[in-house]
From Swiss-Prot:
This is Large ribosomal subunit protein uL2mz, N-terminal part. The gene is RPL2-N. Keywords: Mitochondrion, Ribonucleoprotein, Ribosomal protein. A stretch of 270 kb of the mitochondrial genome is duplicated within the centromere of chromosome 2 resulting in the duplication of the gene. The expression of this duplicated gene (At2g07715) is not demonstrated. In Arabidopsis the N-terminal part of this protein is encoded by a mitochondrially-encoded gene (this entry), while the C-terminal part is encoded nuclearly (At2g44065). It comes from the Eukaryota. One of its GO terms (cellular component) is mitochondrion. One of its GO terms (molecular function) is mRNA binding. It is found in: Mitochondrion. SMART domains: Ribosomal_L2. Belongs to the universal ribosomal protein uL2 family.
Length: 349
């Protein structure tokens, strides 16, 4: 019996362009080409790697191949599982804890003259106080012994602080909120005027008073690589991750990670100021109709996956077909359960 030439489903058809034997300039390069009825290509499901079972809806004619095609509605195992490659191949997150109790990096505290000293502190538990340093001791004072308490004398001004607290103490202190006091505090302690989280410039010039300036300090004339007074430096700070004074005024206790995340996050545009997009009456009606369908539930559509497969001469409408994935050991049990549920003969594809 010759199948009826019904119109193919639009979601499974695609058209190809025809040149009729002409090139881009319109000249005939291949003779006896062109004309004929328009042929639409059918998408055939040839790469199904899941064990599934379906019912043949109809047998259709395909003008592009000598065999017939069958429209199959899959009732079991039709949807292929999508593997989340990001979660599968993502490496496990590792939390790196500080193992040394010395400060090192691009902006090392050795450049700050006479106020921050690198000293090893007696750690009571491993990994707990490894990132603490002694602040306030002069550089010429010998380190304290491990038998005595490292923070015994309060008159010397030695305190236990974190590394990030040392770096941001000049910015997060209440003195930094006042403009006059902040300049005097930062200039006396030798902190940089602006800290940039990047590889350039490699050095910075601390702002020091004339009384404190000596041989162990850097001057603006010695450091020519930074050139903080240039226009390019201002644009680099504005465009990249320059730490501004306003960000420190907003948050009194701001960590190094928090400052980096605050600068990396892009400001969101104000959606209220943007003009609203005009919505046509047709779109409003469609939305209202969809809402009614969802509430009533009467107009439910069978959304089972439907595909085209190559049909054999024995395949007819209404028969059961089954796709077997023999690479998996569970295929045999799946086939036995399918035969028990449906005693009709199954066609494996």
């Amino acid at each position: 019996m010759r199948p009826g030439r019904a119109r193919a489903l639009r979601q499974f058809t695609l058209s190809t362009g025809k040149s009729a034997g002409r090139n881009s300039s319109g000249r005939i390069t291949v003779f006896h080409r062109g004309g004929g009825s328009k042929r639409l290509l059918r998408r055939i499901d040839l790469k199904r790697s899941t064990s599934s079972m379906g019912i043949v809806e109809s047998i259709e004619y395909d003008p592009n191949r000598s065999s017939q095609i069958a429209l199959v509605r899959w009732i079991k195992g039709g949807c292929q599982k999508k593997m989340n490659t990001i979660e599968k191949f993502a490496p496990p997150r590792k939390i790196l804890e500080p193992t040394t109790n010395t400060i090192s990096g691009l902006f090392s505290f050795s450049f700050l003259p006479g106020k921050v000293d690198k000293r090893k502190v007696a750690c009571f538990s491993p990994g707990l106080m490894a990132a603490y340093v002694v602040v306030g001791l002069p550089t010429g004072m010998p380190p304290l012994s491990s038998s005595k308490s490292a923070f015994a004398s309060k008159g010397a001004g030695s305190t236990k602080t974190l590394v990030k607290d040392v770096f941001f103490s000049a910015f997060s202190s209440p003195k930094a909120k006042r403009e006059t006091a902040s300049l005097a505090f930062a200039s006396s302690f030798g902190f940089p005027r602006i800290a940039v989280a990047g590889a350039k410039p490699a050095f910075f010039a601390p702002r020091m008073r004339q009384k404190v300036r000596g041989k162990s300090t850097f001057s603006l004339c010695e450091v020519q690589k930074g050139r903080t007074h240039s226009i390019l430096w201002a644009h680099r700070i504005k465009g990249k991750a320059g730490l501004s004074w306003q960000s420190f005024r907003r948050q009194d206790t701001l960590g190094l990670v928090g400052a980096a995340g605050h600068k990396k996050s892009k400001p969101k545009t104000d959606q209220g100021n943007l003009p609203a997009k005009p919505i046509g009456e047709r779109a409003k009606q469609l939305k209202a109709l969809r809402g009614l369908r969802a509430k009533d539930g009467a107009c439910k559509v069978d959304r089972a996956p439907v595909t085209y497969i190559i049909a054999s001469h024995q395949l007819e409408a209404g028969k059961m077909v089954m796709n077997c994935d023999w690479s998996k050991p569970s295929t045999s049990s799946f086939l036995q359960s399918a035969q028990n549920d449906h005693p009709k003969p199954l066609f494996t594809v």
